[in-house]
Amino acid sequence: MIEEEKIDENELEEDKFIQKIEKLNDFQDEHKYLFRVCLLGDAGVGKTSLLTRFCDNYFFENYNNTIGIDFRVATLKYDNIISKIHIWDTAGQERFRSLSLNYINNSHGFIFIYDITSSLSFEKVEKWISLALQKNNHTVANFLVGNKSDLEQERKVSKSKAEDFAKKNKLFFLEASAKNHINVEKLFYYFLYKMVEFYKTNEYIEDANMKLTTEKTEEIPTERESEKSCFC
C-alpha cells in the first residue's frame, strides 16, 4: 500500500504548477504516462458537469443522469512530460454500483464529489470512500470536491466542515463550480501534477494493483466502442 503523504494546507492555493501545464490536442498519440482517475459521488452532484466543463469548456443547465460509465481522455504536458488521463464518470445510482467497481479497481486516484447545497450528498461521501478504498487502497492522489460553489446562498455544507473531513481522510480538498468555471482546471491539473511528481521518483514501483501504464499500453473500457477526447 502506498502511504499517503501529509497534506500541505496551502498547497492547493499555490498555482505555480498550473502555469507549467499545457493542454494538448487529444489526437496527440505519443505520451509517457497514462493515468486513470474515477469520479465518484451521488447522482446530481455534478460529476458530468465538471468533466464537460474541463473537456469541452461548456456547461449545460440540465443533464441527464449518467447511465453506467462515461469516459473521456485528456492529454496534458507538464515539466516537458506528456501524459494522458483517462477520466471515468461513474453513475451515482445504486443499480450501477457494481459496474463502478470495475473501474475503481484500476484507478490511480479518486475524486469524491458532493453538492455544497446537499447535506445528504456530503454524508454519502463517506460511503463512497469506504467502497473505493476497500477495492483499491493503492491510489496516489485522492480528492474531495464540493461542487456548485456558485450557489453560496443555498449552501448546506460549510467549507470548514468539509476541510476537516478531508484532513481526517487524507484527501486534497477544494470547492468548485462547473457553472462558473471555478477551480475546474485546478482540480484535474493538480491530479496530473501529483501523479507525475510521484512517478518521476518512483518509476520502479512493483505492485500488481498500481502498475504504471505507459505509452503503447492503453486500456480502453469495453463498455464504450470509442473514447471521447477533451477539447477546449
List the predicted regions and their residue ranges.
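Amphipathic helical hotspot of TIR/SEFIR-family domains
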Residues: 119-137, 190
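Conserved P-loop small GTPase signature centered on TRAFAC-class small GTPases
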Residues: 1-44, 48, 78-82, 138-232
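Inter-motif core of Ras-like GTPase G domains
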Residues: 97-118, 131, 135
